[in-house]
């Protein structure tokens, strides 16, 4: 029974009802004059303009009362829809009175729209389409589209003009009282208020029969008020509120990232989720995360309540709830069981690729920070300097199963973008394994021979040997599964104590790893074995020291283990490698002191030499022998060279045991340029305009910079910071557009019998190899059988996967070009086939039907986008070198098929370059190409760098000079395949 049923409010005469109608009851404003809807008038293309076949500009003049439009010409010498000025209108009205009719404002537009005969227009347009070409045709097609749409939807064109404005419910445009008696209100209320005020004033003026010009002005103001309400700022200056801030109109409420759709409908906040700071959890297994107890209680609350009631620890749900709030002892007992086997999802923003969300099994930890496994930080691009992550609980059984099967972190060892391991040890773990596998000549106990690994461990524990000691071990002591040859098993293997310990973490039947080379994966090289009884000291005296295992090699080991043993074994190995690394890096006691930053004796001499060279160049400039540009170019070259010399000398002077060198050499942290800045010189700095300042910073951080040097350095540092902020936004937007176009490319079938493929060869940039042939064919299917050119034997047959061995064989046979199945030539409807796509990089297996490869590709281009800098790069300081757009802007340029900056001319014919004539007066040169049928001449700027000389043969579609090609031109001259291949090549650079 509703208490207030049927009662009517005595103040306002509205029936009393529940307050939620404030969110659903609309009102409306009846306008005293019609008003056009700005979306239909200003949207691109202007829908009103298309229906009436008038330009948006003339529409604007009519709507905002600047000119009259003829509605009925009568006998007057004017056309229908012609624009006339005020003066002309009065003249015509006087002369042709009765039949002549013209008007202005939305009323006139409404009448014109009402007069449109849609069916007639449609037939007219269809006739026109048969002969029209070019722009006319495009316009006709657009008009036909809209006319058809009106006919099919039964909407009338005159409805684009409004007589009534709807008012949204009051709770959707709230007004709240602030402290101090002021009110805060939604912008919409202001906008509605302006409409109401102007509308009422217009009504009053009409009742008073005010002069036409005043009414006209008021109608225009009403039109503008309604425009601002619907889409503020679309036309003219936006209406501003207090503090000159543009008011948010109805359109803005829906638009963009902060609008209704993306913010609240696609991006809701969800229940059973939380976020917290992350911290490192070295004690975790690969598929675990540490969940703080207070978070766990909150996230799993309904599960705990259910469990408490089923175990009869609480009488009903309400008492269970009370128990949880009191943090009863029972709750903790139940919690352990509830979270067991219940995976949770962890996400770190920005989620750049699919590894930004992974599933883990929670383990309860104390404190308030979530603990993350150190190896997955790479995939999340997370660090522990205060990063936060979000956690989500999958509720239904299906969701849990999906998280467990598809998203467990242990299964995501390879990155989907290139198939290389993304969970590789970093920092401490790297330095630990590096330290462990280092060898040193002459350490204590060198040349001892052990009967087995355990004996070596005992010797180490008793301080007889060190990890770095080079020792021998009887090969026969290894388990039978270890791949040694029979000959090797009868000998003694020379290795180091640390390597014996390192190899214990590898699978039993994995080869013993004794040197950081890929060949070692096939088995240990015979050169590490000596006969039992041979003197090991002689052997050690002659044999050079083997390098330690660096970060890249650890990654190779992981990839190899993954290839052989798949997920489970690899994740176990990763955990063992992590624990070993942490343990040994702790034992190594690696420290850094000021004394580790060594002084370079030769530095003053190198600097003096450079200063002298600069003085010489300056002298030449003063005498007028060289231009200012040349002087600047040479000075910067001299200093760059000086810095390089210092860098080389520094590397020579390093002790291999220098901790800073070890950090950098192992790949744990830092690179050579950090070190050069500490111990060498900082070198040339970029100025505020991006131009290099020719005064170098000769000091390093150890000596300390002068005030002047410090000041010069700040430009570059500041630019770096602002670049980073800008490029993140750009890259995110690029990824979003890429995903948008590629998301429906899915693997639909196994094979589509396509008879076309793509011939691939190594991608070159000038003379340097960007991507070798091996990388391009690996994991793809051959289109044609490939034969060895020497022996003629078949290496791979058609539609067979090219795996590592086949790819090596092809490269070793000296074959430079292979035709492979490709997604470019796929004939599958709405997607691609398994044979076209090849191997799924994330799993190393052939791709499954149903894999969303388009999205994976989009994310793989978008994710490194953040790493690409915004910088535009000068070509090695060569005067006249074109400014080549690099990094992110270049990728965007390719993807959007824009006309690139500094583009190259391309040849439209295949033939021979017959002449290159320079014309200094116009700063151009003409290149003539003689084809089989016709001859073409191209005009290039004088400074353009040529790719062909006279007499060279040229193919159609080749660039004549250096620079990027415009993809649209290339497409016109050649076929889709060439263009696709060109775009692919460019992006890979």
From Swiss-Prot:
It comes from Leuconostoc pseudomesenteroides. Binds 1 Mg(2+) ion per subunit. Mg(2+) binds at residues 383, 385, 387. One of its GO terms (cellular component) is DNA-directed RNA polymerase complex. Its cofactor is Mg(2+). InterPro entries: DNA-dir_RpoC_beta_prime (IPR045867), DNA-dir_RpoC_beta_prime_bact (IPR012754), RNA_pol_asu (IPR000722), RNA_pol_N (IPR006592), RNA_pol_Rpb1_1 (IPR007080), RNA_pol_Rpb1_3 (IPR007066), RNA_pol_Rpb1_3_sf (IPR042102), RNA_pol_Rpb1_4 (IPR007083). The RNAP catalytic core consists of 2 alpha, 1 beta, 1 beta' and 1 omega subunit. When a sigma factor is associated with the core the holoenzyme is formed, which can initiate transcription. GO terms for biological process: DNA-templated transcription. Pfam families: RNA_pol_Rpb1_1, RNA_pol_Rpb1_2, RNA_pol_Rpb1_3, RNA_pol_Rpb1_4, RNA_pol_Rpb1_5. SMART domains: RPOLA_N. It catalyses: RNA(n) + a ribonucleoside 5'-triphosphate = RNA(n+1) + diphosphate. It is an enzyme of class 2 (transferase). One of its GO terms (molecular function) is metal ion binding. It comes from the Bacteria. SUPFAM superfamilies: beta and beta-prime subunits of DNA dependent RNA-polymerase. Keywords: DNA-directed RNA polymerase, Magnesium, Metal-binding, Nucleotidyltransferase, Transcription, Transferase. DNA-dependent RNA polymerase catalyzes the transcription of DNA into RNA using the four ribonucleoside triphosphates as substrates. Its EC number is 2.7.7.6. Belongs to the RNA polymerase beta' chain family. This is DNA-directed RNA polymerase subunit beta'. CDD domains: RNAP_beta'_N. The lineage of its organism: Bacteria, Bacillati, Bacillota, Bacilli, Lactobacillales.
């Amino acid at each position: 029974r509703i208490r207030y049923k049927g009662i009517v409010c005595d103040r306002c005469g509205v029936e009393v009802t529940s307050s939620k109608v404030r969110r659903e009851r609309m009102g409306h404003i009846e306008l005293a004059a019609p008003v056009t809807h700005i979306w239909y008038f200003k949207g691109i293309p202007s829908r009103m303009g298309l229906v009436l076949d008038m330009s948006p500009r003339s529409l604007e003049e009519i709507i905002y009362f600047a000119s009259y439009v003829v509605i009925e010409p009568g006998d007057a010498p004017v056309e229908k829809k012609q624009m006339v000025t005020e003066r002309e209108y009065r003249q015509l009205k006087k002369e042709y009175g009765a039949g002549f009719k013209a008007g202005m404002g939305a009323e006139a537009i409404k009448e014109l729209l009402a007069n449109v005969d849609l069916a007639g227009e449609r037939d007219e347009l269809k006739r026109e389409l048969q002969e029209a070409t070019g722009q006319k045709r495009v316009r006709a097609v657009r008009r036909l589209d809209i006319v058809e749409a009106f006919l099919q939807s039964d909407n009338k064109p005159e409805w684009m003009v409004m007589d009534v404005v709807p008012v949204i419910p009051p709770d959707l445009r709230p007004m709240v009282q602030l402290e101090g008696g002021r009110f805060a209100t939604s912008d919409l209320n202001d906008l509605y208020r302006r409409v109401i005020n102007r509308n009422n004033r217009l009504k009053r003026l009409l009742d008073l029969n005010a002069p036409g010009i005043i009414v006209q002005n008021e109608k225009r103001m009403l039109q503008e008020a309604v425009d601002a309400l619907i889409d503020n700022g679309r036309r003219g200056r936006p209406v501003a509120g207090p503090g000159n801030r543009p008011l948010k109109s109805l359109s803005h409420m829906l638009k963009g990232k902060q609008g209704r759709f993306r913010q609240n409908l696609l991006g809701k906040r969800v229940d059973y989720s939380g976020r917290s700071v992350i911290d490192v959890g070295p004690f975790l297994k690969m598929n675990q995360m540490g969940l703080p107890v207070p978070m766990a209680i909150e996230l799993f609350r309904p599960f705990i309540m259910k469990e408490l009631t089923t175990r009869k620890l609480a009488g009903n749900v309400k008492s269970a709830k009370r128990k949880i709030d009191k943090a009863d002892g029972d709750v903790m007992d139940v919690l352990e069981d509830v979270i067991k086997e219940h995976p949770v999802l962890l996400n770190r923003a920005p989620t750049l690729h699919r590894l930004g969300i992974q599933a883990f099994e929670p383990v309860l930890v104390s404190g308030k920070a979530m603990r993350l496994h150190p190896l997955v930080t790479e995939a999340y691009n997370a660090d522990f300097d205060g990063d936060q992550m979000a956690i989500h609980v999958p509720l239904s059984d299906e969701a849990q199963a999906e998280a467990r099967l598809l998203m467990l972190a242990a299964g995501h060892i390879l990155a989907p973008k290139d198939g290389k391991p993304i969970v590789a040890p970093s920092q401490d773990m790297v330095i630990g394994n590096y330290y462990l596998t280092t060898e040193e000549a002459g350490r204590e106990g060198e040349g001892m021979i052990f009967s087995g690994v355990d004996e070596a461990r005992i010797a180490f524990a008793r301080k007889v040997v060190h990890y770095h000691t080079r020792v021998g071990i009887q090969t026969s002591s290894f388990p039978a599964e270890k791949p040694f040859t029979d000959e090797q098993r009868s000998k003694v293997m020379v290795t180091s104590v640390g390597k014996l310990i390192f190899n214990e973490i590898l699978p039993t039947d994995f080869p013993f790893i004794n040197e950081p080379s890929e060949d070692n994966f096939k088995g240990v090289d015979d050169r590490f074995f000596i006969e039992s009884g041979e003197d090991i000291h002689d052997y050690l005296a002659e044999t050079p020291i083997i390098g330690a295992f660096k970060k890249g090699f650890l990654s190779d080991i992981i990839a190899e283990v993954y290839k052989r043993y798949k997920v489970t074994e690899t994740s176990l190995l990763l955990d063992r490698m992590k624990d070993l690394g942490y343990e040994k890096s702790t034992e190594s006691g690696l420290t850094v002191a000021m004394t580790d930053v060594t002084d370079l004796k030769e530095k003053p001499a190198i600097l003096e030499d450079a200063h002298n060279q600069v003085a010489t160049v300056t002298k030449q400039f003063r005498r007028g022998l060289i231009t200012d540009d040349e002087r600047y170019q040479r000075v910067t070259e001299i200093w760059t060279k000086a810095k390089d010399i210092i860098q080389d000398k520094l590397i020579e002077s390093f002790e291999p045991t220098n901790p800073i060198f070890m950090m950098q050499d192992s790949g744990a942290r830092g690179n050579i340029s950090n070190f050069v800045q500490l111990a060498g010189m900082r070198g040339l700095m970029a100025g505020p305009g991006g131009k290099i300042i020719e005064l170098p910073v000769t000091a390093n951080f150890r000596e300390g910079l002068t005030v002047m040097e410090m000041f010069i350095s700040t430009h570059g540092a500041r630019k770096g910071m602002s670049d980073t902020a800008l490029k993140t936004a750009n890259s995110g937007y690029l990824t979003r557009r890429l995903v948008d176009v590629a998301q429906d490319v899915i693997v639909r079938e196994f094979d589509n019998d396509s008879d076309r493929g793509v011939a691939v060869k190594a991608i070159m940039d000038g003379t340097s190899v960007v991507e070798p042939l091996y990388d391009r064919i690996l994991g793809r299917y051959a289109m044609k059988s490939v034969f060895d050119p020497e022996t003629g034997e078949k290496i791979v047959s058609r539609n067979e996967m090219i795996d590592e061995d086949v790819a090596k064989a092809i490269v070793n046979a000296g074959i430079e070009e292979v035709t492979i199945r490709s997604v470019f030539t796929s004939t599958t409807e709405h997607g691609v086939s398994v044979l076209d796509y090849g191997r799924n990089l994330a799993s190393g297996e052939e791709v499954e039907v149903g894999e969303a490869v388009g999205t994976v590709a989009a994310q793989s281009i978008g994710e490194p986008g953040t790493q690409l800098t915004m910088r535009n790069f000068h070509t090695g300081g060569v005067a006249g070198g074109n400014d080549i757009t690099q990094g992110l802007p270049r990728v965007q340029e390719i993807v959007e098929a824009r006309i690139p900056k500094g583009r190259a001319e391309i040849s439209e014919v295949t033939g021979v370059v017959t002449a290159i004539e320079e014309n200094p007066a116009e700063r151009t040169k003409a290149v003539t190409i003689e084809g089989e049928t016709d001859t073409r001449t191209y005009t290039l700027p004088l400074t353009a760098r040529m790719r062909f000389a006279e007499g060279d043969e040229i193919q159609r579609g080749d660039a004549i000079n250096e620079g990027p090609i415009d993809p649209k031109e290339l497409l016109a001259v050649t076929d889709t395949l060439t263009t696709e291949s060109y775009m692919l090549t460019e992006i890979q650079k």
